[in-house]
């Protein structure tokens, strides 16, 4: 029996292992490769996908990433990471699948979430949350009453009988 196929060739050089990529990074590479195939661009079709993907990634000895500070970070080079960085986070505000923004606030007196509405922008939803939070603070301070010598948070200006 000939077992020559199990013997390694002395001229064989092993291919270096690909870097550990996250699922999002692999997905981005596959999508860009498919776009190149569908649009019939991308140059030489005989080159391996790993080589094409590794050219899109920054070199591993590039130093720490300016966004996250991790050495040899591959995630910050992808657009999904940049989009996440650009979004501001507002308390009580979340983005719905439809692209609109919803706002809600926890009402401790009724122990329920109070729906504030759906808004076209995150800033409008945050403003609605801020107004509702201010109303809750007013309600709480009015319920507690002001102590002797202390004024309320929102003092009335003028219009009083002297």
UniProtKB/Swiss-Prot annotation:
It is found in: Nucleus. Its main location: nucleus. Residues 1-21, 84-103, 139-162 are annotated as: Disordered. Pfam families: AP2. Residues 89-146 bind DNA. Residues 87-98 have a biased composition (Basic residues). InterPro entries: AP2/ERF_dom, AP2/ERF_dom_sf, AP2/ERF_ERF_subfamily, DNA-bd_dom_sf. GO terms for biological process: ethylene-activated signaling pathway. One of its GO terms (cellular component) is nucleus. PANTHER family: ETHYLENE-RESPONSIVE TRANSCRIPTION FACTOR ERF120-RELATED, SHN SHINE , DNA BINDING / TRANSCRIPTION FACTOR. Probably acts as a transcriptional activator. Binds to the GCC-box pathogenesis-related promoter element. May be involved in the regulation of gene expression by stress factors and by components of stress signal transduction pathways. Belongs to the AP2/ERF transcription factor family. ERF subfamily. This is Putative ethylene-responsive transcription factor ERF121. It comes from Arabidopsis thaliana. The gene is ERF121.
